[in-house]
């Protein structure tokens, strides 16, 4: 039993380095979802995770090199993608979009670190380019379309799902993902499940 636990711990520790050896970032998917499994209300921003989970998310951001969101997340949420709740360096913003002109007034296009922008067309080339720019650990924060994009291309190494008790009568369903849960963390009213792909 002890050797099995040690083996699992070792796998988690070396996982980021194993992906770096093949020239792409270690990719962490992260989202919060309602008690019914919705990631957000349709067309509007929805606050789901509690303040303690928010602080933990900012700690994660401070530990990573880049943070990626899709076009709709920028358009609807206008996120800062920074670490304002904790000390540390802001990760470099990355945006997936085929039309950034409509996003130019958003916050992340008017800050010190200019976002790296990519289309949805060539995911492997995008990841290789990010790696060449020093993005060795990448946090994907959404939205649902963007998470689905990475899952369908089998381009994820870890998922951190914040399960909340917030209720949304309707909305956009959270991504469907299959993986092995290797850790679960209770954060006040939220529960965070850590998954990795099946071997």
Regions found by a protein language model. Give the residues of each.
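Enzymes that bind and transform nitrogen-containing heteroaromatic metabolites
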Residues: 1-199
């Amino acid at each position: 039993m002890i050797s099995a636990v040690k083996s699992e711990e070792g796998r988690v520790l070396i996982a980021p380095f194993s992906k770096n050896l093949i020239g792409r970032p270690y990719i962490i998917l992260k989202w919060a979802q309602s008690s019914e499994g919705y990631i957000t209300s349709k067309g509007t921003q929805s606050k789901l995770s509690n303040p303690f989970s928010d602080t933990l998310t900012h700690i994660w951001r401070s530990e990573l090199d880049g943070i990626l969101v899709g076009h709709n997340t920028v358009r609807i949420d206008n996120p800062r993608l920074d670490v304002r709740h904790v000390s540390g360096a802001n990760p470099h913003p990355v945006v997936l979009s085929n039309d950034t002109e409509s996003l130019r007034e958003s916050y992340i296009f008017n800050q010190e670190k200019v976002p790296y922008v990519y289309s949805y067309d060539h995911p492997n080339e995008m990841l290789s380019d990010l790696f060449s720019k020093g993005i060795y650990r990448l946090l994907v924060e959404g939205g649902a379309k963007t998470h689905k994009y990475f899952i369908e291309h089998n381009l994820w190494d870890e998922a951190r799902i914040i399960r909340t008790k917030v209720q949304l009568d309707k909305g956009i369903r959270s991504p469907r993902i299959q993986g092995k849960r290797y850790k679960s963390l209770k954060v006040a009213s939220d529960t965070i499940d850590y998954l990795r792909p099946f071997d």
